[in-house]
Amino acid sequence: MQPPGDDAAPRCPFAGAHAPDAPHVPEAAGDDAQAGWHRAQLDFSQSMSYGDYLSLDPILDAQHPRSPDHNEMLFIIQHQTSELWMKLALYELRAALASIRDDALPPAFKMLARVSRVLEQLVQAWNVLATMTPSEYSAMRPYLGASSGFQSYQYRELEFILGNKNAQMLRPHAHRPAIHAHLEASLQAPSLYDEVIRLLARRGFPIAPERLDADWTQPTRHDRTVEAAWLAVYREPNAHWELYEMAEELVDLEDAFRQWRFRHVTTVERIIGFKQGTGGTSGAPYLRKMLDVVLFPELWHVRTTL
Protein backbone atom coordinates (compact mmCIF):
# COMPACT_ATOMS: atom_id res chain seq x y z
CA MET A 1 0.00 0.00 0.00
CA GLN A 2 1.21 3.52 -0.83
CA PRO A 3 1.32 6.00 2.11
CA PRO A 4 -1.11 8.99 1.84
CA GLY A 5 0.38 12.04 0.17
CA ASP A 6 3.18 10.15 -1.59
CA ASP A 7 3.50 10.42 -5.35
CA ALA A 8 2.45 7.45 -7.38
CA ALA A 9 5.14 4.88 -7.81
CA PRO A 10 6.86 5.17 -11.20
CA ARG A 11 5.47 2.78 -13.78
CA CYS A 12 7.85 0.23 -15.28
CA PRO A 13 9.10 1.71 -18.58
CA PHE A 14 8.77 -1.71 -20.23
CA ALA A 15 5.12 -2.20 -19.23
CA GLY A 16 2.29 -1.68 -21.70
CA ALA A 17 0.21 1.52 -21.81
CA HIS A 18 -2.59 -0.08 -19.77
CA ALA A 19 -0.42 -2.04 -17.37
CA PRO A 20 -1.97 -2.28 -13.90
CA ASP A 21 -0.31 -0.69 -10.90
CA ALA A 22 -0.48 -3.97 -8.99
CA PRO A 23 2.58 -6.21 -9.05
CA HIS A 24 2.72 -8.35 -12.16
CA VAL A 25 1.72 -11.97 -11.67
CA PRO A 26 3.20 -14.25 -14.34
CA GLU A 27 0.68 -15.98 -16.53
CA ALA A 28 0.53 -19.74 -16.70
CA ALA A 29 3.34 -21.19 -18.76
CA GLY A 30 0.83 -22.63 -21.20
CA ASP A 31 -0.67 -19.26 -22.12
CA ASP A 32 0.53 -18.73 -25.70
CA ALA A 33 -0.18 -14.99 -25.52
CA GLN A 34 2.40 -14.60 -22.75
CA ALA A 35 4.87 -17.31 -23.75
CA GLY A 36 7.05 -15.04 -25.90
CA TRP A 37 7.18 -17.32 -28.91
CA HIS A 38 3.63 -17.07 -30.29
CA ARG A 39 4.80 -14.95 -33.26
CA ALA A 40 7.83 -17.07 -34.05
CA GLN A 41 7.95 -18.77 -37.43
CA LEU A 42 7.10 -22.43 -36.98
CA ASP A 43 6.74 -23.65 -40.57
CA PHE A 44 10.02 -24.08 -42.46
CA SER A 45 8.76 -26.14 -45.38
CA GLN A 46 9.48 -23.22 -47.74
CA SER A 47 12.34 -21.44 -45.95
CA MET A 48 15.74 -22.04 -44.38
CA SER A 49 15.76 -23.25 -40.79
CA TYR A 50 18.48 -23.13 -38.13
CA GLY A 51 19.51 -26.70 -38.92
CA ASP A 52 19.57 -25.98 -42.66
CA TYR A 53 21.80 -22.93 -42.22
CA LEU A 54 24.29 -24.81 -40.03
CA SER A 55 24.18 -28.05 -42.07
CA LEU A 56 23.52 -29.85 -38.82
CA ASP A 57 22.43 -33.15 -40.35
CA PRO A 58 25.87 -34.06 -41.78
CA ILE A 59 27.65 -32.64 -38.73
CA LEU A 60 25.56 -34.59 -36.23
CA ASP A 61 25.75 -37.71 -38.40
CA ALA A 62 29.57 -37.63 -38.44
CA GLN A 63 30.11 -39.55 -35.19
CA HIS A 64 30.67 -43.24 -35.87
CA PRO A 65 32.04 -45.11 -32.84
CA ARG A 66 33.93 -48.27 -33.76
CA SER A 67 33.81 -49.87 -30.35
CA PRO A 68 30.85 -50.88 -28.15
CA ASP A 69 32.23 -48.66 -25.38
CA HIS A 70 30.02 -45.80 -24.17
CA ASN A 71 32.95 -43.37 -23.78
CA GLU A 72 34.06 -43.41 -27.40
CA MET A 73 31.43 -40.80 -28.30
CA LEU A 74 33.14 -38.34 -25.95
CA PHE A 75 36.50 -39.09 -27.55
CA ILE A 76 35.16 -38.52 -31.07
CA ILE A 77 33.27 -35.31 -30.29
CA GLN A 78 36.22 -33.88 -28.35
CA HIS A 79 38.45 -34.23 -31.40
CA GLN A 80 35.85 -33.18 -33.97
CA THR A 81 35.02 -29.98 -32.11
CA SER A 82 38.74 -29.27 -31.70
CA GLU A 83 39.11 -29.55 -35.47
CA LEU A 84 36.28 -27.05 -35.94
CA TRP A 85 37.94 -24.58 -33.57
CA MET A 86 41.24 -25.08 -35.42
CA LYS A 87 39.46 -24.36 -38.70
CA LEU A 88 38.37 -21.00 -37.26
CA ALA A 89 41.86 -20.30 -35.89
CA LEU A 90 43.40 -20.95 -39.32
CA TYR A 91 40.76 -18.79 -41.01
CA GLU A 92 41.61 -15.89 -38.69
CA LEU A 93 45.38 -16.40 -38.96
CA ARG A 94 45.30 -16.35 -42.76
CA ALA A 95 43.31 -13.12 -42.67
CA ALA A 96 45.71 -11.65 -40.11
CA LEU A 97 48.66 -12.54 -42.35
CA ALA A 98 47.05 -10.72 -45.27
CA SER A 99 46.33 -7.65 -43.13
CA ILE A 100 49.90 -7.51 -41.84
CA ARG A 101 51.27 -7.72 -45.38
CA ASP A 102 49.03 -4.77 -46.28
CA ASP A 103 50.10 -2.79 -43.18
CA ALA A 104 46.50 -2.89 -41.95
CA LEU A 105 47.26 -3.67 -38.32
CA PRO A 106 44.01 -2.87 -36.43
CA PRO A 107 42.07 -5.66 -38.21
CA ALA A 108 44.97 -8.02 -37.55
CA PHE A 109 44.85 -7.22 -33.83
CA LYS A 110 41.19 -8.28 -33.69
CA MET A 111 41.90 -11.49 -35.60
CA LEU A 112 44.86 -12.45 -33.41
CA ALA A 113 42.87 -11.74 -30.25
CA ARG A 114 40.16 -14.03 -31.57
CA VAL A 115 42.68 -16.81 -32.19
CA SER A 116 43.85 -16.49 -28.59
CA ARG A 117 40.24 -16.89 -27.41
CA VAL A 118 39.85 -19.95 -29.66
CA LEU A 119 42.92 -21.47 -28.03
CA GLU A 120 41.37 -20.83 -24.62
CA GLN A 121 38.34 -22.84 -25.77
CA LEU A 122 40.66 -25.65 -26.82
CA VAL A 123 42.36 -25.58 -23.41
CA GLN A 124 39.01 -25.92 -21.63
CA ALA A 125 37.99 -28.79 -23.91
CA TRP A 126 40.69 -30.98 -22.35
CA ASN A 127 38.78 -30.75 -19.06
CA VAL A 128 35.89 -32.63 -20.65
CA LEU A 129 38.12 -35.36 -22.06
CA ALA A 130 39.83 -35.65 -18.67
CA THR A 131 36.60 -37.14 -17.29
CA MET A 132 37.61 -40.33 -19.13
CA THR A 133 39.48 -42.74 -16.85
CA PRO A 134 42.41 -44.98 -17.87
CA SER A 135 40.21 -48.09 -17.77
CA GLU A 136 37.58 -46.42 -19.96
CA TYR A 137 40.17 -45.37 -22.53
CA SER A 138 41.77 -48.82 -22.52
CA ALA A 139 38.43 -50.36 -23.48
CA MET A 140 38.25 -48.36 -26.72
CA ARG A 141 41.92 -47.85 -27.57
CA PRO A 142 42.30 -51.07 -29.64
CA TYR A 143 39.66 -49.71 -32.03
CA LEU A 144 41.68 -46.56 -32.83
CA GLY A 145 44.30 -48.38 -34.87
CA ALA A 146 47.19 -46.07 -35.75
CA SER A 147 45.03 -42.94 -35.86
CA SER A 148 46.40 -40.11 -33.74
CA GLY A 149 46.04 -36.38 -33.25
CA PHE A 150 49.66 -36.26 -34.43
CA GLN A 151 48.19 -36.75 -37.92
CA SER A 152 45.84 -33.75 -37.78
CA TYR A 153 46.62 -31.75 -40.91
CA GLN A 154 44.93 -28.65 -39.50
CA TYR A 155 47.11 -28.81 -36.42
CA ARG A 156 50.16 -29.20 -38.66
CA GLU A 157 49.17 -26.14 -40.68
CA LEU A 158 48.66 -24.22 -37.45
CA GLU A 159 52.19 -25.13 -36.36
CA PHE A 160 53.59 -24.11 -39.75
CA ILE A 161 51.80 -20.74 -39.79
CA LEU A 162 53.07 -20.05 -36.28
CA GLY A 163 56.64 -20.83 -37.37
CA ASN A 164 57.32 -24.34 -36.06
CA LYS A 165 58.36 -25.77 -39.44
CA ASN A 166 59.43 -29.38 -39.98
CA ALA A 167 59.35 -30.90 -43.46
CA GLN A 168 59.20 -34.42 -41.99
CA MET A 169 55.71 -33.64 -40.73
CA LEU A 170 54.46 -33.71 -44.33
CA ARG A 171 55.00 -37.46 -44.56
CA PRO A 172 51.84 -38.59 -42.70
CA HIS A 173 49.82 -36.80 -45.40
CA ALA A 174 51.51 -38.24 -48.48
CA HIS A 175 48.51 -40.51 -49.11
CA ARG A 176 46.30 -37.43 -49.59
CA PRO A 177 47.90 -35.38 -52.40
CA ALA A 178 45.70 -32.28 -52.09
CA ILE A 179 46.31 -31.96 -48.35
CA HIS A 180 50.02 -32.69 -48.80
CA ALA A 181 50.30 -29.93 -51.42
CA HIS A 182 48.43 -27.47 -49.20
CA LEU A 183 50.70 -28.18 -46.24
CA GLU A 184 53.81 -27.99 -48.39
CA ALA A 185 52.76 -24.53 -49.57
CA SER A 186 52.32 -23.49 -45.93
CA LEU A 187 55.74 -24.93 -45.08
CA GLN A 188 57.41 -22.89 -47.82
CA ALA A 189 55.58 -19.62 -47.10
CA PRO A 190 56.62 -17.01 -44.54
CA SER A 191 55.08 -17.64 -41.14
CA LEU A 192 53.00 -15.13 -39.20
CA TYR A 193 56.07 -14.03 -37.27
CA ASP A 194 58.15 -13.77 -40.47
CA GLU A 195 55.57 -11.31 -41.79
CA VAL A 196 55.70 -9.33 -38.56
CA ILE A 197 59.50 -9.12 -38.83
CA ARG A 198 59.12 -7.84 -42.40
CA LEU A 199 56.74 -5.26 -40.93
CA LEU A 200 59.45 -4.16 -38.49
CA ALA A 201 61.79 -3.62 -41.44
CA ARG A 202 59.16 -1.60 -43.32
CA ARG A 203 58.80 0.58 -40.23
CA GLY A 204 62.49 1.45 -40.42
CA PHE A 205 64.12 -1.00 -38.01
CA PRO A 206 67.49 -2.40 -39.20
CA ILE A 207 66.68 -6.11 -39.52
CA ALA A 208 69.51 -8.29 -40.83
CA PRO A 209 69.09 -9.07 -44.57
CA GLU A 210 69.61 -12.78 -43.96
CA ARG A 211 66.65 -12.76 -41.56
CA LEU A 212 64.42 -11.04 -44.10
CA ASP A 213 65.41 -13.55 -46.78
CA ALA A 214 65.49 -16.67 -44.61
CA ASP A 215 64.70 -20.23 -45.60
CA TRP A 216 61.00 -20.25 -44.72
CA THR A 217 60.95 -24.04 -44.40
CA GLN A 218 63.07 -23.84 -41.24
CA PRO A 219 61.75 -23.21 -37.72
CA THR A 220 62.06 -19.72 -36.26
CA ARG A 221 65.45 -18.97 -34.70
CA HIS A 222 66.50 -16.11 -32.47
CA ASP A 223 67.94 -13.09 -34.28
CA ARG A 224 69.73 -10.31 -32.43
CA THR A 225 68.58 -7.58 -34.85
CA VAL A 226 64.96 -8.59 -34.31
CA GLU A 227 65.43 -8.50 -30.54
CA ALA A 228 67.02 -5.05 -30.82
CA ALA A 229 63.99 -3.84 -32.77
CA TRP A 230 61.56 -5.15 -30.17
CA LEU A 231 63.67 -3.63 -27.41
CA ALA A 232 63.31 -0.22 -29.07
CA VAL A 233 59.55 -0.75 -29.36
CA TYR A 234 59.17 -1.71 -25.71
CA ARG A 235 61.33 1.15 -24.48
CA GLU A 236 59.20 3.71 -26.32
CA PRO A 237 55.77 2.14 -26.71
CA ASN A 238 54.00 5.44 -27.38
CA ALA A 239 56.28 6.13 -30.33
CA HIS A 240 55.62 2.67 -31.81
CA TRP A 241 52.15 1.94 -30.49
CA GLU A 242 50.95 -0.33 -33.29
CA LEU A 243 54.09 -2.45 -33.12
CA TYR A 244 53.85 -2.52 -29.34
CA GLU A 245 50.27 -3.76 -29.56
CA MET A 246 51.29 -6.32 -32.18
CA ALA A 247 54.01 -7.62 -29.87
CA GLU A 248 51.56 -8.07 -27.02
CA GLU A 249 49.01 -9.80 -29.25
CA LEU A 250 51.71 -12.26 -30.28
CA VAL A 251 52.71 -12.88 -26.67
CA ASP A 252 49.06 -13.49 -25.77
CA LEU A 253 48.79 -15.91 -28.67
CA GLU A 254 51.88 -17.91 -27.75
CA ASP A 255 50.90 -17.94 -24.10
CA ALA A 256 47.52 -19.45 -25.01
CA PHE A 257 49.19 -21.93 -27.37
CA ARG A 258 51.56 -23.06 -24.62
CA GLN A 259 48.65 -23.58 -22.24
CA TRP A 260 46.89 -25.70 -24.86
CA ARG A 261 49.98 -27.85 -25.29
CA PHE A 262 50.49 -28.17 -21.53
CA ARG A 263 46.88 -29.20 -20.93
CA HIS A 264 47.27 -31.78 -23.69
CA VAL A 265 50.28 -33.28 -21.91
CA THR A 266 48.60 -33.45 -18.52
CA THR A 267 45.44 -34.98 -19.97
CA VAL A 268 47.45 -37.65 -21.79
CA GLU A 269 49.45 -38.44 -18.65
CA ARG A 270 46.24 -38.65 -16.66
CA ILE A 271 44.57 -41.07 -19.08
CA ILE A 272 47.34 -43.23 -20.58
CA GLY A 273 50.36 -42.45 -18.42
CA PHE A 274 53.59 -42.89 -20.37
CA LYS A 275 52.43 -45.47 -22.90
CA GLN A 276 53.40 -45.06 -26.54
CA GLY A 277 50.93 -42.97 -28.53
CA THR A 278 48.60 -44.68 -31.01
CA GLY A 279 50.40 -42.93 -33.87
CA GLY A 280 53.79 -44.31 -32.83
CA THR A 281 55.16 -41.31 -30.94
CA SER A 282 56.53 -41.71 -27.43
CA GLY A 283 53.29 -40.21 -26.13
CA ALA A 284 53.58 -37.91 -23.13
CA PRO A 285 57.40 -37.57 -23.36
CA TYR A 286 57.05 -36.36 -26.97
CA LEU A 287 54.37 -33.86 -25.94
CA ARG A 288 56.54 -32.61 -23.06
CA LYS A 289 59.40 -32.00 -25.48
CA MET A 290 57.06 -29.86 -27.58
CA LEU A 291 56.57 -27.58 -24.57
CA ASP A 292 60.13 -26.34 -25.12
CA VAL A 293 59.32 -24.98 -28.59
CA VAL A 294 59.34 -21.16 -28.61
CA LEU A 295 57.44 -19.55 -31.47
CA PHE A 296 58.42 -15.89 -31.07
CA PRO A 297 61.79 -16.07 -29.25
CA GLU A 298 62.81 -12.41 -29.31
CA LEU A 299 59.56 -11.33 -27.67
CA TRP A 300 60.41 -13.49 -24.67
CA HIS A 301 64.14 -12.63 -24.58
CA VAL A 302 63.44 -8.90 -24.62
CA ARG A 303 61.67 -9.16 -21.27
CA THR A 304 64.94 -10.08 -19.61
CA THR A 305 66.76 -7.19 -21.29
CA LEU A 306 64.25 -4.49 -20.36
From Swiss-Prot:
Residues reported in the UniProt entry to bind heme: H264
EC code: 1.13.11.11
Example GO molecular function: tryptophan 2,3-dioxygenase activity
Pathway of action: Amino-acid degradation; L-tryptophan degradation via kynurenine pathway; L-kynurenine from L-tryptophan: step 1/2
Kinase in keyword set: no
Xref: Pfam families: Trp_dioxygenase
Region listing for Disordered, in residue ranges: 1-33
Gene3D superfamilies: 1.20.58.480
Cofactor(s) needed: heme
Keywords: Dioxygenase, Heme, Iron, Metal-binding, Oxidoreductase, Tryptophan catabolism
Annotated binding of substrate, by residue: F75, I76, I77, Q78, H79, Y137, R141, T278
Enzyme kind, highest EC tier: oxidoreductase
PANTHER family: TRYPTOPHAN 2,3-DIOXYGENASE
Role: Heme-dependent dioxygenase that catalyzes the oxidative cleavage of the L-tryptophan (L-Trp) pyrrole ring and converts L-tryptophan to N-formyl-L-kynurenine. Catalyzes the oxidative cleavage of the indole moiety.
Subunit composition and interactions: Homotetramer.
Family under the similarity heading: Belongs to the tryptophan 2,3-dioxygenase family.
Protein name, UniProt field: Tryptophan 2,3-dioxygenase
Encoding gene, per UniProt annotation: kynA
